[in-house]
Amino acid sequence: MIMNKTTLLHEGKAKKVFLTDDADLVIQEFKDDATAFNNKKKGSIADKGVVNNAISCRLFTMLEEHGVNTHLVEKLSDRDMLCRRLDIIKVEVVVRNIAAGSLVRRYGFTEGTVLARPIVEFYLKDDDLDDPLMIAEHAVALGVATMDELEVLKSRAGAINDVLKKFFADRRLKLVDFKLEFGRHKGEILLGDEISPDTCRFWDLDTDEKMDKDRFRFDLGGVEDAYTEVQRRVLELD
């Protein structure tokens, strides 16, 4: 499909979103910019946008095949994804399978502990407030989502986790945790944003080597190689 970018609708940390000639569709352009710690650390990862677009398009397509409705229409180019325009729900949904990151800092888990069951968390999508952890009642009180919508988000996140865990295990990757964003579209709730090493923690199944943005966060080196290896496993091992 030929689709032209018109007006820049939004520019975030990792992507730009453009309006198109069709009011129902937007183009999501993936950037190489990298940030961590709520924008306190900034940098760039070579070809990150190309890698993340490729991974996200493959994963969205695979999730659609498993009955998960997403905003993906099609991959337009190396960096551009054509998407349905969503009314974004200002709730970041985080699913945790293995203790890492803020779960370790906040609750004292030992990093690498496999959780007895996945934990689903809600965070308010607000950079000025550093995306605070919240319970469902907070989201309802703030008017960002209804209780029914939050139940859908939690259920949908669990179903997505089941599909992704198996997909990545088949590719010798542990899905430690990941962030999802959803939006409203014509009365439906669709999965939006991206699924990539920017939004997921991936550890090698055999060595526990970190293969995600933690390599950038904590100056571990080999960031580009890790992203490229995840892309290889996602795309080449079908």
UniProtKB/Swiss-Prot annotation:
Pathway assigned in UniProt: Purine metabolism; IMP biosynthesis via de novo pathway; 5-amino-1-(5-phospho-D-ribosyl)imidazole-4-carboxamide from 5-amino-1-(5-phospho-D-ribosyl)imidazole-4-carboxylate: step 1/2
InterPro entries: SAICAR_synt/ADE2_N, SAICAR_synt_PurC, SAICAR_synth, SAICAR_synthetase, SAICAR_synthetase_CS
Class in the EC hierarchy, top level: ligase
Catalytic activity: 5-amino-1-(5-phospho-D-ribosyl)imidazole-4-carboxylate + L-aspartate + ATP = (2S)-2-[5-amino-1-(5-phospho-beta-D-ribosyl)imidazole-4-carboxamido]succinate + ADP + phosphate + 2 H(+)
Gene3D superfamilies documented for this protein: ATP-grasp fold, B domain, Phosphorylase Kinase, domain 1
BP-aspect Gene Ontology terms: 'de novo' IMP biosynthetic process; cobalamin biosynthetic process
SUPFAM superfamilies per UniProt: SAICAR synthase-like (SSF56104)
GO MF: ATP binding; phosphoribosylaminoimidazolesuccinocarboxamide synthase activity
Pfam families: SAICAR_synt
PROSITE patterns tied to this protein: SAICAR_SYNTHETASE_1 (PS01057), SAICAR_SYNTHETASE_2 (PS01058)
Annotated keywords: ATP-binding, Ligase, Nucleotide-binding, Purine biosynthesis
EC code(s) of this entry: 6.3.2.6
Family that this chain belongs to: Belongs to the SAICAR synthetase family.
Record-given protein name: Phosphoribosylaminoimidazole-succinocarboxamide synthase
Organism in which the protein naturally occurs: Chlorobium phaeovibrioides (strain DSM 265 / 1930)
UniProt lineage: Bacteria, Pseudomonadati, Chlorobiota, Chlorobiia, Chlorobiales
Gene: purC
